[in-house]
Swiss-Prot record:
Modification after translation: Processed by the macrocyclase-peptidase enzyme POPB to yield a toxic cyclic heptapeptide. POPB first removes 10 residues from the N-terminus. Conformational trapping of the remaining peptide forces the enzyme to release this intermediate rather than proceed to macrocyclization. The enzyme rebinds the remaining peptide in a different conformation and catalyzes macrocyclization of the N-terminal 7 residues.
Keyword Protease: no
An annotated Gene Ontology molecular function: toxin activity
Protein name listed in UniProt: MSDIN-like toxin proprotein 1
Superkingdom, taxonomy of origin: Eukaryota
Keyword list, A-Z: Toxin
Length: 32
């Protein structure tokens, strides 16, 4: 599963930098 996650994470962030930047703080607050 590490392989898929490592490939999906960077690809998603690269394809959706705007969304990633907006979701980043949300995930940090809810995840932590």
């Amino acid at each position: 599963m590490s392989d898929i996650n490592a490939t999906c994470l960077p690809a998603w962030l690269a394809l959706c930098p705007c969304v990633g930047d907006d979701v980043n703080p949300t995930l940090t607050r809810g995840g932590t």
